[in-house]
Each structure stands twice: as structure tokens, then as C-alpha cells.
Amino acid sequence: MNIQLRHITTLLYIIATTSLVAATPDSVLTEHQQAWNLLDAETWKNPALHGQAFKTAYSQLAISLDLTDQTEAFTLQKGTGSTLYDIEADTYLRLSDHSSVWGKASYMTGKNRNIKWNSVSDYELLEPYILADTMGGNTERERYVFEGGYAAKVGSVLMGGEMLFRAEHEYRTIDPRMRAIVTDLTLRGGVAYETGTYLLGAAAEANIYKQTDNVTFYRETGVIPEFQMTGLGAIYVRFSGEVNNLYFNGGGAQLYLNVQPRNGQGLFTNITIGEHRYERIAASLNSLPLTKLYREEAKLQAGWRKSGKTDLAIYADAQYICRLGDENMVGSSQSNSYPILTTLTMYKNNIIDASMNMVYGQRQHSSWHIAMKVGYMQNHEKYVEPERKQNVSRIYSQLSAQYITGLGKKGTLTCALTGGYHKNLDSQLSIPVVNTEKAAVKMQNHNFRYLKADYTVVNAQIRYDYGIGTSRYAMFGALSGGATFCSESEYEQYLAVKLGITF
């Protein structure tokens, strides 16, 4: 028995030692895929600093399938899930020690299921000023994305520019036949200056947004009214019904300020300030402006970090969003023209989200990182007259881990796991039922039921990369899955499969 134990122990030792020798993951893959990079997501919005993000070149071409399904819609306007197919190419190239370029191109197609009370694209961006009906249904989607940037360093000065473009088409082939076409263009320019120990950066962003939207009915017996929504179940009654041809004009600007340690160790700060506006216009009424949504944002990220063989970051995140909505009071038509009598600010929405974060990890034979987050969020909405209110506040926590290791002589295995919990602290909904469409009251109560619920979130991912011969090419496969469990006894499931090559 002792001899057998010695043989087993010796065998396990040999396997462990062999695995340790071979367990060195691909260094380029690790640099570009490690969870530590999430800490720099805000910093890299300055293209001058994005140009210094990586020391190595990396490109990836992949196809993917994403499946999401909810047992009941948490938000009626977003539906119960989607099936999306995507092909995407990403690249980051070092042209020299002082310059780099990066880019992305993707095409996505698929279907959203069981959408109600929403006949536009980009619901989260434009709500509450949307076109909506009670029937809804599935929608087909197409999206094209093109992004590209360039950065260079001259002496102690870093300069960079970036362009991001999105075109999207969403439509339905049965009544009510909604069709929305979106174009979204963003331009960024940034600079940074190297001092003895810090990088001081500043960047500006300009955005132009447009969406055309219309709803048609092919069967006269199937016509239902399209509502012009104005917030918390309120409806602009005068222009609801047959005003189904709209477009949204919008855009805005943002300013980014950055302070980053040059050697990876020290205090850091990222500040974002921005304003955007989106106007809803009735195309069929001689381009009559109906409403305008203002969105102001301020974001702060500040803390201390140390990177190297051992990574550690402790920092705070805080975000404030103020959304105000103006409605135009319109007079009687005169020669097919509608005079605007006055403009009233009727919708107000304030969002605060603050969290404390810590990230710790090591990069030696393998790379692993653990991230922890604890935060507080409150969302207050108000419609002025007749008064409507919806207030929600919650605390949340999240724990995530990532492990990257070599597997065999040419393989790299990446595993990630995330768990989170969202706990409702306080919630309130007040709607004047007498002055509200019955179906809209039902919709608002449904959404509020899930807005004030508690949620438990679990997600996992596994990815394997395998080198091809002696070249820098590798092929990979990735599988992601997760579930969100709601205290209202409903849940969401998520599954994604991705296959591709890297070089």
C-alpha cells in the first residue's frame, strides 16, 4: 500500500511539475485580455492615452451567437430577450515606439422578442420621449459599427484622434410595422503631457445623432393608436393616434480630464463632463418639434493603483446624470404650419450612482485578478403636471475573478466568474390613475414591479486559445453563460458562443 502511495505521489508530482513548466500563457493575449484593463476603460476614452495602452500588437476576427431570454419582461419596452449573430474584427497595432493605430468593424443581425410600448430604437437613450403602442411584437435588427483611431508621441506630448460610427436598422414585418434607422457619429481628439511622474490628459468629444422612425399598418382593421409618450405613463394626447412618422435629431459634447501615473504606481483621476440633447420632431406635421430631452452627466473616478507582477487598485466611482424634458405647447394649424406658443419643462430625472472598488491580482507563471465593488444607486423621476413620481434607491455588490494560464505548449485557458446582488432600499410610484390611459397605468405598474425588485446575478466564461504552428496566429473558442434571478420569481438566462482567430 505504501509503495502504491509513493508511486501515485511521484506521478502527481511529475504531472504538476510538467504543468507548471508549460503553464505560461501567451503574453500578448494576457496583455490584451486581462481583467486589469477594465480599470483603464475611462482613461482610454482619451485617444492620446489609448495610444499608449499596449506594448504589443494584437488583432482578432470572430463570429458569435448571443442568446438572452426572460421568463417575463423586466421592462416591457425592452422585450423578453434576443437572438443576435455577430461578426467582428478588432485590431491594435504598434507602428513604432511612438505611434499606434487601432480599429474595429462589426456587423450584427438578429431578433428582439416581445417588445411592447416601444416603436423606436435606442430606447434607453431617448426615453421617455418615444413612440409606443400596446401591441408590439418581435423586431428584426441590423447594426454596422466602424471605429478607428491614431495616436503619436512627440517629445513629452501625446496626441490622438478617434472616430466611432454606428448605423442601425430595426423593423417589424407584421402590424404594427415599425421601422427605425439610426446613424450615430462620434469624433474624439485628445492630448496628454508627460511630467516627471504623471501623465496629464485632456480630450474633447462631439456626437451627432439621428433616427428616423415610422409605424405603418397594412390591414385597415388592425390599426391601433400610436402614443406620443412624455414620461411615467403620460401621453401627448393631441399628437397621438395617427402621427406615426417621426425623426430624432440630437448630439452633444463631452470633456475628459485624466491624471495617470507614468510608471503605473500612484494616484489617478478621470473626470467626465458632458451634455447631449435629443429633439423629437413630427415629420408628417411639417417637421413640428414636439419635445426635447436634455442629458447632463458628470463622472469621477479617483484612487490609487500599482501595476507590475502584483496589481492593486483601490478607487471610488461616482456618476451623476440629470435628464430634463421640454414639451412644446402648440397652437392651431395655420396653412399647414403649427405655431409653438410656449415650452414647458415637464419631465425631470436625477440619477446618482457611487461605488467603492478594489482590484488585486498577480502576473507571473499565470495571470489572475479579483475585483470587488460595493455601491449605492438612486433614480428619481418626476412629471410636473398632473404630478407623477417614481423613486427607487438600492445598494449593490459585485465580486468577479479572472484566471489566465497556459494549457499545454501552445494553449492558453481563460476562466472568469462574476457574482452580484442588488438590494432595494426604498421605492415609490405615484400616478394619477384618473388622468392616465388604463393600458399605460398597467404598463407603468408592471415596470415598477421589476424596478423595485432584488436581483442576484451570476455569470461565467471560459475561453481557450491554441497557437497554430510557429506563427503568431491562434484560433480560439469562448463560451459564456449566466442568469439573473429576480425576487419577483422570474429570471433571465444568457448564453454566448464565440469562435475566431487572433494574430
Located regions from the model:
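Outer-membrane beta-barrel "beta-signal"
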Residues: 27, 491-503
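Short, flexible helix-coil linker/hinge segments at the edges of structured domains or between repeats
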Residues: 116-130, 205-249, 277-290, 332-336
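Transmembrane beta-strands of outer-membrane beta-barrel proteins
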Residues: 57-63, 100-105, 157-163, 200-204, ...
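Outer-membrane beta-barrel channels and translocator barrels
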Residues: 94-98, 153-157, 194-196, 262-264, ...
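Long, internal scaffold/assembly segments composed of regular secondary structure
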Residues: 234-374
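Transmembrane beta-strands of outer-membrane beta-barrel pores
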Residues: 63-71, 107-111, 152-156, 165-169, ...
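Outer-membrane beta-barrel translocator domains and adjoining extracellular loop/strand segments
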Residues: 71-78, 114-120, 171-179, 213-220, ...
